[in-house]
Amino acid sequence: MTPPALTPRLLLRAYALGIFPMAESRDDPEIHWVDPRRRGIFPLDGFHISRSLARRIRRMDWTVTVNEDFAGTVRACADRDDTWINPTIFRLYVGLHALGHAHSLEVREGDALVGGVYGVTLGRAFFGESMFSRRTDASKVALAFLIDRLRAGGFTLFDTQFLTPHLASLGAIEIPRADYHRRLGEALAGKAEFAPPGYSPDPASVVQRSSQTS
């Protein structure tokens, strides 16, 4: 029996079940489905902005954009020696972006992408897929602006898939699979906006709101 074709809509169904895809490498055509025993999440009221990062954000000469170069952001995330983003995964997420279920946040120095993050939205859940940094702290700046946006839009779950030391230093935690699936079910029952009406963040307000909630 031939398995169903892997499409963006089928991918959304997998996310709703708490499963996400990965490839072993960019050259591996196979897709593996993952449901970790322990899951990384970012409590949206627990993002830690250090004093040095707060200064960087307040004084930065970078600009932050949203959904202006989704494909470029995914390519930049894959531009490393080892990556799980193969051509099939790239195609699927570009398809999700066209459906309005995948978004990018870019950090720019002039016209150049120097940092960014992308992920999938479903209900009140945001599934962070990957991020990149071509300048010191650029990915941290992207996360700060992303989390501020998720809070403003009514999101309740930020899934980081795995917990890395870098994410842990910024406030991410690890929870058991059963706890994750409970939180996911609650998030899927609601609705959130990645582009909430009237939301227009500036660097100082992002730092201020983060210090009030963390």
Curated annotation (Swiss-Prot):
Its EC number is 2.3.2.6. It comes from the Bacteria. Keywords: Acyltransferase, Cytoplasm, Transferase. It is found in: Cytoplasm. Residues 194-214 are annotated as: Disordered. One of its GO terms (biological process) is protein catabolic process. GO terms for cellular component: cytoplasm. It catalyses: N-terminal L-lysyl-[protein] + L-leucyl-tRNA(Leu) = N-terminal L-leucyl-L-lysyl-[protein] + tRNA(Leu) + H(+); N-terminal L-arginyl-[protein] + L-leucyl-tRNA(Leu) = N-terminal L-leucyl-L-arginyl-[protein] + tRNA(Leu) + H(+); L-phenylalanyl-tRNA(Phe) + an N-terminal L-alpha-aminoacyl-[protein] = an N-terminal L-phenylalanyl-L-alpha-aminoacyl-[protein] + tRNA(Phe). It is an enzyme of class 2 (transferase). Functions in the N-end rule pathway of protein degradation where it conjugates Leu, Phe and, less efficiently, Met from aminoacyl-tRNAs to the N-termini of proteins containing an N-terminal arginine or lysine. PANTHER family: LEUCYL/PHENYLALANYL-TRNA--PROTEIN TRANSFERASE, LEUCYL_PHENYLALANYL-TRNA--PROTEIN TRANSFERASE. Belongs to the L/F-transferase family. This is Leucyl/phenylalanyl-tRNA--protein transferase. It comes from Cereibacter sphaeroides (strain ATCC 17025 / ATH 2.4.3) (Rhodobacter sphaeroides).
